[in-house]
Amino acid sequence: MRTVGGVVVLVTGTALMLGLLSGCGSGGGGARKRGAFPPSARPSSAPPSVSPTPAPSGAKTVNPEEKWDGKVRILGDGSTSSTGPQPHQPKPVKLKPGEKPPQFLVFSWDGALQGDDEQFSHFREVAKENNAQMTFFLTGTYLLPKSMASKCRPPQHKRGEMAILYATDQHIRDTLEQLRGAWLEGDEIGTHFNGHFCGAKGGGDWSVAEWKSEIEQSYSFVENWKTNTGYKDLPPLPFDYRKELAGGRAPCLEGQKNLLKAAKSFGWRYDASSPGDFQIWPSKNDGIWNFPLQLVPYPGTERQVLSMDFNFLYNQSGERTQGDPVEYEQWRKLTRDSYLNGFERVYNGSRAPLFIGNHFEDWNGGIYMKAVEDVVESVCKRDGVRCVTFKQLADWLDVQDPQVLAKMRQLDPAQSPDWKSLVK
């Protein structure tokens, strides 16, 4: 173990396991403060057991069990609304005997700010062009103007204090537009919580009650953005956040133990705050689906790297977010090929879902954004592949036979079983 720039790096055997840093991407008001990325825990070293924006064109797919009376209701101060079931949601279907599971991929984004680089809107387009849907983990305070900082009461910190910068007024407006459009396109709006505190007095030190406070504030910033911003000219978000929010990812992946206890009281269905694991089928942690980032093979080495942009950055340019431009193209290909290696391993093997996490950032000339885009374009239209949200994956897992899922969890990532004998 060694510490570099406040980041703990652990090297064990053939796998380089980096502390995962779920920071907030670049883009004007979304810039992070210096030192906002302290260390996180490593994955287990044990091997796996062997007028609102109009909806996009196309049919509206809804859960038939979700009833709606057809009436749009404005909620609270007009920040949100109830417009019925979310459009473009696939109906989860139980595997038939002998059926091979779909190959699921989940692309998720921490922070979800529409900054000057307009990456939120860009990746919405990438998703639409490739039959994909994505999860956007919103930092709640990105809807809170700095002038209203006193509304933010972070656990163990002063009122209004943040480890990241407040968004500009224009970025708040732009982010609201993106959230509205993303939900109507079938994307998921999850949470990255609020102040992005890590390390001492961060999420890892918070009690269950403090996590509950953080979660309540996550709801409040979305449900009261009109009051907080004074933007009366904008339409409400087309969803009831109390009903839609199903999970999130904690900053720096810290504090999952107490977070899960708090999340359960809100009825959340999954959590993506695990510090990492192998590519195996998910399991539940105290009734909540655990969706960790995963170790994927790094080309030309025996190492595996966790499936998030910062981990590739560290492998390639260390602490520098802008390394040698001569290396950018090679680094982009290595990052892309790592993700594709992880994909091919399970696509031709266990079919365990692949989770890829990212930020809206421009590190090393934006190569990590391009690598993710390359992967979306390469795999999301392939036979048997479904690029979905975490919420949609939870829907699918919930209708499967628990005994079949238990057998699938025993598979090594590259192990291709006899599906006819496994799925009964």
Residue map of PLM features:
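Short, hinge-like loop/turn segments at secondary-structure boundaries
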Residues: 152-155, 208, 406
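N-terminal export and membrane-targeting signals
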Residues: 1-14
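Short aromatic-enriched loop/helix-cap "lid" or pocket-rim segments at secondary-structure transitions
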Residues: 147-150, 202, 259-262, 284, ...
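C-terminal domain-boundary segment and adjacent tail
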Residues: 81, 135, 270-283, 337-424
